[in-house]
Amino acid sequence: MAAVSVIPNGDEFHLEGGAIAVLMVHGFTGSPASIRPWAEALHREGFTVRAPRLPGHAQTWEEMNKTRWSDWYAEVDRNFSELKKKYQRVFVAGFSMGGALSIRLASIRGQEIEGLMLVNPSIHDPRASMKLVPLLQHVIPSLGGRGTDVAAPNPPKHSYGRTPLRALRSLQKLWKVVQRDLYLVDVPLMVGYSVNDHVVDPKNSEMVIDNVSSIDIREVIFERSFHNVALDYDLDLLVEESVSFIKDVLSGAVNRDERDLIDAEFDAIVSGLSLDESAPTTYLDELDEIEAAEEYRGDNKPLPTLSSTQRAALVGVIGGPLYAVSVQFLKFDPLGLGAWPGAIALFAGIVTFFWQMRPDNDDDDGVAL
């Protein structure tokens, strides 16, 4: 039996409904609590909903550091198999990293999935600081988290306030696998993204839309919410679009493969109609053409990539040894103090990192990817 969640309402849940089931997957360092409002709304529409808690999540960052992406995916796959045995048709929905895991499932078991719903899917992060994770994971086990990226005030706690670096490194490996296999995804697809997401760049969604093989892709834009839409102002829009997508797939209004498209083209020709075969233009493309647009900023300020303390520590850890090497081998000693300044900077940087590892503040909340 899995350990009890330390996050309020963070345990997995199963809401019994009708013969149509939806498997819902939460994000990195998050918990089922982060998607519960979305899940409960789908249940009220008559669907059976299950949201597992991924291994290592909603406990402590130390426990999560013991898990890898293969553990998280295995839990998703296991729950999907259980739903397939009991329910007629099964949809999959993923938020953030849960989107990456859902894409992975669709690339392997796509023929068994009725449709895929993604909200701010996380499949890459080009920030320079992420390139340091492979090194930092061997030096420090975790970094302090950032505030929850929700525009609405007083969001519920749904994750812990630290980022476990070994788990984050494993997430980076998952991203590579998912990017490689995007072309294998051909299920009906709904992709929703926030234009003001401070955690996952909207270009992640653009990458998904541009590289999957799905014939029918429904694009949903959240303009009033930040990263976690299910806890934010656009929850109603998310639910409305999700229900509409599921019903359209069930009714056959959404095409799954090329045969359906060929049939639709034939019917259109017979009816004297024409189908637009031009490449779809996404909302992100349209944003590039807008010269001036007022963005909804919400109540939260944009979140920094690293705090000033973390940046100073990185300078010490990286710059200290470089200074010492320049003194020792290049005879470059601008301060005239030998290698000592470099050694002191390195020591101070390491001490600062360990200070960042102090116990969590239970009132703090980390950003769930």
Describe the predicted segments one by one.
Residues 38, 187, 201-210, 221:
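Short alpha-helix in the alpha/beta-hydrolase fold that links the catalytic acid
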Residues 94-98, 102:
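Gly/Ala-rich beta-loop-alpha elbow adjacent to hydrolase catalytic centers
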Residues 250-369:
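Intrinsic, low-complexity terminal and presequence regions
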